[in-house]
Every structure is written in structure tokens, then in C-alpha cells.
């Protein structure tokens, strides 16, 4: 209950109750929780009970407020079914400190003035329910302050339950979860997650519909939950229905009401203004426990060499992938990474392509509409900030969202890979390793190859990238199955170079298993400075920046690839159609103002040039780039040679 409060707040509440305020935070929390429980019992004992009418069952103790029904505006109250009754005067009567405590307990920002905090609580879907009149809305904390009581809805650990193809919504009451599952009839799974973002109306909301069937058979319910993305929202359970057909009828009616699409024709789904969009889910074996035992145990028990095992456990970590995506705004709760479909990712690309077509026209209204479409297809959690702050209206914002969708594409591949249990699960790390279709050989630190790569890394760290240094954790020699054969036709091409490629940590299971790939036709060409291709650099730090490491996650992974360059089409400025190469040219080069001194390059025995010289200025090159970029439009020109695992050390400013 109180664990989310700061120590100072816990002590303040204890002091108000005349209780001991000494001790560590765990002791203080236990003391306050015990006092809250006693107060809670007194409130519940004195409160009237609520009765469900007809087929409407109150969920988690929520009361039907009778004639006090009113429809709330905003994301949370569109049902207008009277599940909660908002008492604004009660919020206004609270002290600022009490409002802050309530906001923190509801997961709402508690900064700003008193009016700001009240407005956030009123905007929150579940916030008003915490201060409703007329008795308990479930188990509550009661924090006494002076002559007032602040009722804070008690936080409860929620878990997802999977029985059958679909996961029961995590907020369905436990006594229902134990006895019910999501209805499946043949290939039809009666489970729908809907999303709607309207930038102009500041809406970013979800709607969940599920038909529940009792495990024993013969009893059916329809469950709804709705609210602003990022909060629990409100929920309602209809039933039990007399027949399965009646429950399906209610489900399909609600789906049509919210989307203006028929459930039976959802594969041809059309989006409508002010209506929800259906998020297509993958009902394969998702959410399964991929690992048996801890990572440490797996590393000890695997037949893999320890350094390889540690690297595989790093890049094949679903929790890491989820965290990386959450950091850049993606809502992994609403559309779990394991349920991503390729079709959803292509829809995201398609909307970004349409945004790129109008981004230079300064058509604000059109950009608002398209931005809403993008956030509807690719759910984001913006909390209660104004949606207009997140309009995709500049090339930089477009590129950031393009990189997000690319990362989701890699993760979609990775999650399917990691959920494949056809391999040897007695040694899960070895199974993951085999699924990458790559052979790894660790390089020893005293080897010539290691020394050469270390020099290449150190020498080509640009002066403009001075905010961090890196330490090499491990270097692997790598061979992707089938890549050498495809590269063979370019093996004798002159001008082959060893070049850098960096990417997010979450992308590497997908990249290594599938190879480096070119963006699909659905992606906007304007997001790529020299057209759609695979980009490389001869400066380590230029590629290292694309690892997007942080203080929270300092690990980064980069590739060194042999790239067949041949005759190059040199460009000083952006050219989105650069993939249409002039005759005789094999790839493009964006020419930078600083580049490794080619006189100091090393030539390997197989003729590959390693540009590891110290950087030098190229005064004659006055284009738009600080450093060189090499772009190939045919992946057969690429052969992976080395994988580097590094740690970033960020300098304090």
C-alpha cells in the first residue's frame, strides 16, 4: 500500500496518527500499512453494500450509483453506465499534501500547483473512482489528515492468466480468472483490443472486449475495460449470459459500436474518424516462460563456451527488449511485444509514409490526424501530457518514429524466434544460439585480430562524440550461415572495406538471425538520407551512436562487416533517391568532412581494407555530413565478420 510513498510522506502519515516514526523505510511502511488496514476495516464495516442488477455485475466492488449516473468527458467515461460517480468538491476540499499522496497512489504526476494536480486526477480514468461518494469502491487505504479522510484505492498485484489461446485481461477479478477462460469457437477467439488516439481532442485511449466461458462449460460473460492508455481505467462484467450465442452477440455488438466494423469482416478492417482501431494480435504461443531457471544457471549448465553464452543471454532477453521500447514511448502493455504481428508493423510504416508526404506542407490539421492514426496503430503511453506535444511534424521526429518501427520489426522476429520450442529446451541458451544461424568464435585479447579491431575502434572515435568512452567486453568472429555463398559474386570486387554498423541492443537477435535488411516498400524514403539501404561508417563512434546506450543500459553491440563497395556514387548532401544508382556504380557514399587517413589503413591477407587511420579533416569536402556514410542497396554485398560487445562510459557534465 504505502511502499510507493516517499519516506518523508510515510513518516508524516504516521505522525498524524500518533504512531512511532523511527526506523527504516520497510519498518515504517509495515507500521503504516497495519494502521491503514485497521482503518479500512472500520470503513468497510460502516459502508452500505451494492447490488448488481440484471446481467451487470460490479467488478472489484465498484458500485452502481443509481440516479447519479453521468457521462464523463475525456478518455475514461464514454460508457456512461454509472460505474463511478465523481465528487469534484471532495478533491477541492483536500489539502495540497493529501492531493499529492492521492496522485502518487493513482500513478498520476504530483508536481505543479493544486489546480494542476486536481485536473490530472479528474482526467485520470480511475482517479475519480478513488474519491467517490457512498461507500467502498473496493479495498481502500484511508489516510487521515485533520478533519478529512482521503480514500486511496488500494494497489493490488495483478497477473495475466492464460488458459487457451488468449490471455485473460489482467484486471479481471481473481475469482473469475480461476473459473473462466476466453471463449474460442474453432479458429474464432473472442478477444479484442482496441485503440484510439485523437490528437486534437487529447484522446489516447483503449477498449478491451472479451467473451468469458466457464471452465466447466455452460456459463458465459462479456468483459469490458476502457480508459486512457497507461492507467487501469474502468471495467464492467456483463452476465452470466443464458447462452453462448447471446454472449457472442453482445461482444460483436460492442465491437461494431466502437469500431464501425463487423467482427466477421475484421480482416478487412477500415479505420473511421472518432472510432477505435482494432489491434491485430498474434495468438501463437506467447507470454511463455522462455527461460528455465535463472540466467546464471543457464550459463553454468549450457554446452556453449561461457563468453558466447553470456552474449546470447544478453541479446535474447525479452525483458530487455520490452524495457528498451518502453524507454522510447512504446506501450508494451497494450500491445505486448510477443503479440506483435508483421501486418501491424507494416501499417505503422504506411502511416509514417503518409506523414512524410505532408510534413513539408505545414498542414497542421492533416498532421494531427495522421499522427493520431500512427499512435492508434503503434500504441504509445504519454501519461496525461497533452497530445499536441507529440505531433510528428518535423523530419527529426519522423526519423525517430521510423527507428522505433524498425526496432519493433526486429523484435517481432526475435519474439517468434525465442518462442519456438521445437529446439532442445534442456539447454535453452544453446537452442537460442542455433536459432541465430551464426557461428561465433571469441577472439583472445592477445591476438592480432583483436589488436587490429581495438586500434580501429580507438582511432576512429570522433572528437564530436566526446560524451562517452567505451570498453570492449568481448569480440567474436562471426559467420552467418549462407552469407559467404551469397557474397561470393562480390568476393573479388575491388574496394572491399571493413566497416561499422551499430543498432539498438533490442535489435540484435533479429539482425543476427535474419541478416542486415533494407526497409520495406511501406517505409517513407524521406526517413533515409541516401535512400533505403544498409548504412555503414568508417568512424566507430558514428555507428556507436546508433546503439542508443544509456546510463540505465550501458551495453552496446556493433558489427564489423566486409562490404563490397566497387565504384562509388559520391554525394555531399542528402538524396532520397540515391538508391537509383548511375550506371556502373555499386553503392553510394555520403562524403563527410572528417575521415580516417587512408594512408594509415591496413590491408588484410584477403584484400579487405581496414580504415583504422587517425581521422583527418578533408577541407575540400564541405557537404552536410561530418563523417562518411556508406550505403549499399543489395544485401548480397555484405558479409558479417566480427561482432563487438562494448560497455559505454558516459562522462558527467
UniProtKB/Swiss-Prot annotation:
<keyword id="KW-0677">Repeat</keyword>
<dbReference type="Pfam" id="PF02037">
    <property type="entry name" value="SAP"/>
</dbReference>
<dbReference type="InterPro" id="IPR008893">
    <property type="entry name" value="WGR_domain"/>
</dbReference>
<keyword id="KW-0548">Nucleotidyltransferase</keyword>
<dbReference type="GO" id="GO:0140806">
    <property type="term" value="F:NAD+-protein-aspartate ADP-ribosyltransferase activity"/>
</dbReference>
<dbReference type="Pfam" id="PF05406">
    <property type="entry name" value="WGR"/>
</dbReference>
<dbReference type="InterPro" id="IPR050800">
    <property type="entry name" value="ARTD/PARP"/>
</dbReference>
<dbReference type="Pfam" id="PF02877">
    <property type="entry name" value="PARP_reg"/>
</dbReference>
<feature type="domain" description="SAP 2">
    <location>
        <begin position="91"/>
        <end position="125"/>
    </location>
</feature>
<feature type="domain" description="PARP alpha-helical">
    <location>
        <begin position="301"/>
        <end position="419"/>
    </location>
</feature>
<dbReference type="InterPro" id="IPR036616">
    <property type="entry name" value="Poly(ADP-ribose)pol_reg_dom_sf"/>
</dbReference>
<feature type="short sequence motif" description="Nuclear localization signal">
    <location>
        <begin position="69"/>
        <end position="72"/>
    </location>
</feature>
<keyword id="KW-0539">Nucleus</keyword>
<dbReference type="GO" id="GO:0140807">
    <property type="term" value="F:NAD+-protein-glutamate ADP-ribosyltransferase activity"/>
</dbReference>
<feature type="domain" description="SAP 1">
    <location>
        <begin position="2"/>
        <end position="36"/>
    </location>
</feature>
<comment type="function">
    <text>Involved in the base excision repair (BER) pathway, by catalyzing the poly(ADP-ribosyl)ation of a limited number of acceptor proteins involved in chromatin architecture and in DNA metabolism. This modification follows DNA damages and appears as an obligatory step in a detection/signaling pathway leading to the reparation of DNA strand breaks.</text>
</comment>
<comment type="similarity">
    <text>Belongs to the ARTD/PARP family.</text>
</comment>
<dbReference type="InterPro" id="IPR012317">
    <property type="entry name" value="Poly(ADP-ribose)pol_cat_dom"/>
</dbReference>
<dbReference type="InterPro" id="IPR004102">
    <property type="entry name" value="Poly(ADP-ribose)pol_reg_dom"/>
</dbReference>
<dbReference type="GO" id="GO:0003950">
    <property type="term" value="F:NAD+ poly-ADP-ribosyltransferase activity"/>
</dbReference>
<dbReference type="Pfam" id="PF00644">
    <property type="entry name" value="PARP"/>
</dbReference>
<keyword id="KW-0238">DNA-binding</keyword>
<dbReference type="InterPro" id="IPR036930">
    <property type="entry name" value="WGR_dom_sf"/>
</dbReference>
<feature type="region of interest" description="Disordered">
    <location>
        <begin position="64"/>
        <end position="84"/>
    </location>
</feature>
<dbReference type="GO" id="GO:0003677">
    <property type="term" value="F:DNA binding"/>
</dbReference>
<dbReference type="GO" id="GO:0005730">
    <property type="term" value="C:nucleolus"/>
</dbReference>
<keyword id="KW-0808">Transferase</keyword>
<dbReference type="GO" id="GO:0006302">
    <property type="term" value="P:double-strand break repair"/>
</dbReference>
<dbReference type="GO" id="GO:0016779">
    <property type="term" value="F:nucleotidyltransferase activity"/>
</dbReference>
<protein>
    <recommendedName>
        <fullName>Poly [ADP-ribose] polymerase 2</fullName>
        <ecNumber>2.4.2.30</ecNumber>
        <ecNumber>2.4.2.-</ecNumber>
    </recommendedName>
</protein>
<feature type="domain" description="PARP catalytic">
    <location>
        <begin position="427"/>
        <end position="653"/>
    </location>
</feature>
<keyword id="KW-0520">NAD</keyword>
<dbReference type="InterPro" id="IPR036361">
    <property type="entry name" value="SAP_dom_sf"/>
</dbReference>
<keyword id="KW-0328">Glycosyltransferase</keyword>
<dbReference type="InterPro" id="IPR003034">
    <property type="entry name" value="SAP_dom"/>
</dbReference>
<feature type="domain" description="WGR">
    <location>
        <begin position="179"/>
        <end position="276"/>
    </location>
</feature>
<keyword id="KW-0013">ADP-ribosylation</keyword>
Amino acid at each position: 500500500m504505502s511502499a510507493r510513498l516517499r519516506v518523508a510522506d510515510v513518516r508524516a502519515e504516521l505522525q498524524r496518527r500518533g504512531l512511532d516514526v523511527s526506523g527504516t523505510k520497510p519498518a515504517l511502511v509495515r507500521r503504516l500499512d497495519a494502521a491503514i488496514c485497521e482503518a479500512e476495516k472500520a470503513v468497510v464495516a460502516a459502508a452500505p453494500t451494492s447490488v448488481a442488477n440484471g446481467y451487470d455485475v460490479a467488478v472489484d466492488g465498484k458500485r452502481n450509483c443509481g440516479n447519479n449516473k453521468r457521462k464523463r468527458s475525456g478518455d475514461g467515461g464514454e460508457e456512461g453506465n454509472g460505474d463511478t460517480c465523481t465528487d469534484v468538491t471532495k478533491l477541492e476540499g483536500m489539502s495540497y499534501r493529501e492531493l499529492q499522496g492521492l496522485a502518487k497512489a493513482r500513478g498520476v504526476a504530483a508536481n505543479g500547483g493544486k489546480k494542476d494536480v486536481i485536473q490530472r486526477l479528474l482526467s485520470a480514468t480511475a482517479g475519480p473512482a478513488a474519491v467517490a461518494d457512498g461507500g467502498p469502491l473496493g479495498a481502500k487505504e484511508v489516510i487521515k489528515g485533520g478533519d478529512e479522510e482521503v480514500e486511496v484505492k488500494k494497489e493490488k498485484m495483478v497477473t495475466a492468466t492464460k488458459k487457451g489461446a488468449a490471455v485473460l485481461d489482467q484486471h479481471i477479478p481473481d475469482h473469475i480468472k480461476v473459473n473462466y477462460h476466453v471463449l474460442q469457437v474453432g479458429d474464432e477467439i473472442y478477444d479484442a483490443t482496441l485503440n484510439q488516439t485523437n490528437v486534437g481532442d487529447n484522446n489516447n485511449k483503449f477498449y478491451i472486449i472479451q467473451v468469458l466461458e466457464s471452465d466447466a462449460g455452460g456459463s458465459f460473460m462479456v468483459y469490458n475495460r476502457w480508459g486512457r492508455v497507461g492507467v487501469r481505467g474502468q471495467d464492467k462484467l456483463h452476465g452470466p449470459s443464458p447462452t453462448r450465442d447471446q454472449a457472442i452477440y453482445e461482444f460483436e455488438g460492442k465491437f461494431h459500436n466502437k469500431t464501425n466494423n463487423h467482427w466477421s469482416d475484421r480482416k478487412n478492417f477500415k479505420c473511421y474518424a472518432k472510432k477505435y482501431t482494432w489491434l491485430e494480435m498474434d495468438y501463437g504461443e506467447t507470454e511463455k516462460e522462455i527461460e528455465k531457471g535463472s540466467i546464471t544457471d543457464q550459463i553454468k549448465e549450457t554446452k556453449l563456451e561461457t563468453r558466447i553464452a553470456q552474449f546470447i543471454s544478453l541479446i535474447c532477453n525479452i525483458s530487455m527488449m520490452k524495457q528498451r521500447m518502453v524507454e522510447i514511448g512504446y506501450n508494451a502493455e497494450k500491445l505486448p511485444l510477443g503479440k506483435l504481428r508483421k501486418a501491424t508493423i507494416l501499417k505503422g510504416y504506411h502511416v509514417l509514409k503518409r506523414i512524410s508526404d505532408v510534413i513539408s506542407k505545414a498542414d497542421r490539421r492533416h498532421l494531427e490526424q495522421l499522427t493520431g492514426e500512427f499512435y492508434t496503430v503503434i500504441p504509445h503511453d504519454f501519461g496525461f501530457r497533452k497530445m499536441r506535444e507529440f505531433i510528428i511534424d518535423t523530419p527529426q521526429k519522423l526519423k525517430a518514429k521510423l527507428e522505433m518501427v524498425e526496432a519493433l520489426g526486429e523484435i517481432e522476429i526475435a519474439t517468434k524466434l525465442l518462442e519456438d520450442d521445437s529446439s532442445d529446451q534442456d539447454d535453452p541458451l544453446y537452442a537460442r544460439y542455433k536459432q541465430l544461424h551464426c557461428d561465433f568464435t571469441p577472439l583472445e585479447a592477445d591476438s592480432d585480430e583483436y589488436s587490429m579491431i581495438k586500434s580501429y575502434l580507438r582511432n576512429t572515435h570522433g572528437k564530436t562524440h566526446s560524451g562517452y568512452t567505451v570498453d570492449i567486453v568481448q569480440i567474436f568472429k562471426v559467420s552467418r550461415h549462407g552469407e559467404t555463398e551469397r557474397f561470393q559474386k562480390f568476393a573479388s570486387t575491388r574496394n572491399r572495406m571493413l566497416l561499422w554498423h551499430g543498432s539498438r541492443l533490442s535489435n540484435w537477435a533479429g539482425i543476427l538471425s535474419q541478416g542486415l535488411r533494407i526497409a520495406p516498400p511501406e517505409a517513407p524514403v524521406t526517413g533515409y538520407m541516401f535512400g533505403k539501404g544498409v548504412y555503414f561508417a568508417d568512424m566507430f563512434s558514428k555507428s556507436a551512436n546508433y546503439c542508443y546506450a544509456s546510463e540505465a543500459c550501458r551495453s552496446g553491440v556493433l558489427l564489423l562487416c566486409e562490404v563490397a563497395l566497387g565504384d562509388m556514387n559520391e554525394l555531399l548532401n542528402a538524396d532520397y533517391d540515391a538508391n537509383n544508382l548511375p550506371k556502373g556504380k555499386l553503392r553510394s557514399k555520403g562524403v563527410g568532412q572528417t575521415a580516417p587517413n587512408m594512408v594509415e589503413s591496413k590491408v588484410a591477407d584477403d584484400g579487405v581494407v581496414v580504415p583504422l587511420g587517425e581521422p583527418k579533416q578533408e577541407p575540400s569536402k564541405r557537404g552536410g555530413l561530418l563523417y562518411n556514410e556508406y550505403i549499399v542497396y543489395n544485401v548480397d554485398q555484405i558479409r558479417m565478420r566480427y561482432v563487438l560487445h562494448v560497455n559505454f562510459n558516459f562522462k558527467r557534465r
